[in-house]
Amino acid sequence: MNSLLMITACLILIGTVWAEDGYLFDKRKRCTLACIDKTGDKNCDRNCKKEGGSFGHCSYSACWCKGLPGSTPISRTPGKTCKK
């Protein structure tokens, strides 16, 4: 039983460590996903969850996501924004 708890705890920790936070980035257009501060939170949350993140919100007119998989393209700064 203790082994099962330890394995579960390790898997949760690994998932947390490998998760990334950042602005959703469109590699093709080379820009971050635009939003309207405060009113764009629902769209950002939906787009972040679609990309595998835990949640998202609008920050500096771009969609900031928490808990994205490492394979999802992100930017650490809002930079140039574009519509999806």
Curated annotation (Swiss-Prot):
It is found in: Secreted. Pfam families: Toxin_3 (PF00537). GO terms for molecular function: sodium channel inhibitor activity; toxin activity. Keywords: Cleavage on pair of basic residues, Disulfide bond, Ion channel impairing toxin, Neurotoxin, Secreted, Signal, Toxin, Voltage-gated sodium channel impairing toxin. GO terms for cellular component: extracellular region. It comes from the Eukaryota. Gene3D superfamilies: Knottin, scorpion toxin-like. Residues 1-19 form the signal peptide. Residues 20-83 form the LCN-type CS-alpha/beta domain. Disulfide bonds join C31-C82, C35-C58, C44-C63, C48-C65. Expressed by the venom gland. Belongs to the long (4 C-C) scorpion toxin superfamily. Sodium channel inhibitor family. Beta subfamily. Beta toxins bind voltage-independently at site-4 of sodium channels (Nav) and shift the voltage of activation toward more negative potentials thereby affecting sodium channel activation and promoting spontaneous and repetitive firing. Has some action on peripheral ganglia, but not on other sodium channels such as those from cerebellum granular cells in culture. Induces sleep, suggesting a strong antiepileptic action. Has the structural arrangement of an alpha-helix connected to antiparallel beta-sheets by disulfide bonds (CS-alpha/beta). This is Toxin Cll9. It comes from Centruroides limpidus (Mexican scorpion). The lineage of its organism: Eukaryota, Metazoa, Ecdysozoa, Arthropoda, Chelicerata.
